[in-house]
Amino acid sequence: MTWKIVSDSGCDFRELKDLALDTNFENVPLTIQVGQEIFIDNAELNIDLMMEKMYATSTASKSACPSPDDYLKAFAGADNIFVVTITGTLSGSHNSAQVAKKLYLEEHPNVNIHVIDSLSAGGEVDLLVQKLNQLISNGLSFDEIVQEITNYQSKTKLLFVLAKVDNLVKNGRLNKLIGAVVGLPNIRMVGEAGPQGTLELLQKARGYKKSLSAAFEEIIKAGYAGGEIIISHRNNDKFCQQFSDLVKEKFPNAQIQAIPTSGLCSFYAEEGGLLMGYEIG
């Protein structure tokens, strides 16, 4: 039995450490258009250059989801396939994956495919992808993994801290009124992915220190009790370190990873932004 874990650019991993036996990890990239230039969000993407060009251009930049054909290519060569996409509320990637699943099963009826709408992005997607690899490593069957990952997803959440939201507003991913408030000097948006996968405002924090304490306050309020955290961030090592210290004061055994955002997550989180996936319960 061979396995594949497939994710789009909502996932920040470009490779998975300790990949399970007989398992491959495939990334299906979204694209980002800056002016007339198209950036493909794969391992070769120079994210710093893309961001530099984005801030230098006066025209609105935008992202585009993978086609069903992109997913079909990624499916090839495995008996069991798990797909994790960025929230379907904000991107057509999930729909493309579902279309590809239908087409692929018509040609390969003996293959198992499970498509997961993360209803999220960044760190929470990373947690789901990492968990799939662990479940495959544990020797579970396809159906058992479907059950386990569904249960696990109900115990993960996304918290984000953003100093800039221009791209989210311009691309219709965030309310303009919220965008106007966050656009004020030194105001950061502390929010979450809601139950339907939309971006919801929790707090408007004035200044760095208040955003740090607000983020910690919100994960505790949501039910965090020392589980794993993955912080995907755009050039914000300082926040990651200080937030980790804050968490470990209360939960010394907490596992916390900090990883750079993908091209897509960098595009939407912008400079200094964080997309934090965490376990609750």
Curated annotation (Swiss-Prot):
Phenotype of gene-disrupted mutants: No effect on export of cell wall protein GspB.
Keywords noted in UniProt: Lipid-binding
Binding-site residues, hexadecanoate: S63, S91
Pfam families the UniProt entry points to: DegV
GO molecular function, one term: lipid binding
DegV domain boundaries: 3-280
Keyword Secreted appears in the UniProt entry: no
Spans through the membrane: none
The keyword Zinc is assigned to this record: no
Highest taxon, organism lineage: Bacteria
Protein's job: May bind long-chain fatty acids, such as palmitate, and may play a role in lipid transport or fatty acid metabolism.
Alphabetical list of PANTHER family matching this protein: DEGV DOMAIN-CONTAINING PROTEIN DR_1986-RELATED, FATTY ACID-BINDING PROTEIN TM_1468
Protein name, entry field: DegV domain-containing protein
